Amino acid sequence: MEKFLRYNIQIGKDQNKDADYGVFVFKPLERGFGHTLGNSLRRVLLSNIIGHSLFAIKIPNVSHEFQSIKGVKEDLTQIILNLKRLVVKIDQEIFGEEEQKETSLEKWPTLKIDFSKGGVLKASDIETPVGFEIINKDMYIATIESGVKFKMELFVKTGRGFTTFSENKELINAINVIAVDSNFSPVLKVGYKVSDIKTTKNEINDVLELEVATNGAVSAAEAVAMSAKILLEHYKPIVTELFDNYNDLRIINEEATVSSSKSSLAISIDELELSVRSYNCLKRAGIHTITQLTDKTKGEIEKIRNLGKKSFKEIIKKIQDRNLKLKEEQN
């Protein structure tokens, strides 16, 4: 059986794995696998990544969300809408999902607001218990009149997807605790596009570009990794239960990328599909194959006669697109 290529993953320029936004490039992929991976990862990212969300609030002498609060500019409905934008991270080692299931509302560690100085109330004014962290501390909550003491408790839990206030209300058996909708997903945006890459003269592969933005509770890279893990755990039983020799099954060619790269080295620079100027400059410099090109350092290529900055950048990009590298500079 012909094995599949092992692809590489590149993070976008000037991005890191801890950022809440990232563009991830998967290449080279077998034809058709760009959409297969892109669509499945996108669906899981949008609906199945675990997050943390407000599910109830408690205010002294307030029993429902339509009640007004003296000395507060906003009504309670607007305050709840503002609080739904609160991004909280719960340390699962301190207060994990299993412990949350076993903890009653009376013993739940709550986030507390005790605001008496008047003025603008922000998320930074919320006191958090051990294991809870507020990400968007500049978030606006309400405006409180001077001399008014405003108190509130916030209940936050771990979950997946979306839960309506009615579903949350069924779990609350306490007086004066108001249930709210919960949107647990830390992923704000997912998009992907698939393009072609010519790896050899007769072979064209897919390139998948996956764009992910999160609310900061998890990084974009972590969200992508989690979505892949979820898919893997769902696919694995299909193989293990239907195929006895699962461990002997080899699908990915571990040497495919290397061998493909080696074979592409010997071919003409014509395959790079360079602009006329870049192509002619290389030819005049006696560079006719990719092998001859990758045997040069960046400094040596920059010194090629009549090769401008634009042509230099084009050549470097064409080499990187084939997962090849130039010769290292000697110290």
UniProtKB/Swiss-Prot annotation:
The keyword Transcription applies. One of its GO terms (molecular function) is DNA binding. SUPFAM superfamilies: C-terminal domain of RNA polymerase alpha subunit, Insert subdomain of RNA polymerase alpha subunit, RBP11-like subunits of RNA polymerase. Residues 1-242 are annotated as: Alpha N-terminal domain (alpha-NTD). Residues 258-331 are annotated as: Alpha C-terminal domain (alpha-CTD). The keyword Transcription applies. One of its GO terms (biological process) is DNA-templated transcription. Signal peptide: none annotated. Homodimer. The RNAP catalytic core consists of 2 alpha, 1 beta, 1 beta' and 1 omega subunit. When a sigma factor is associated with the core the holoenzyme is formed, which can initiate transcription. DNA-dependent RNA polymerase catalyzes the transcription of DNA into RNA using the four ribonucleoside triphosphates as substrates. NCBIfam families: PRK05182.2-5 (NF003519), rpoA (TIGR02027). The N-terminal domain is essential for RNAP assembly and basal transcription, whereas the C-terminal domain is involved in interaction with transcriptional regulators and with upstream promoter elements. Belongs to the RNA polymerase alpha chain family. This is DNA-directed RNA polymerase subunit alpha. It comes from Malacoplasma penetrans (strain HF-2) (Mycoplasma penetrans). The gene is rpoA.
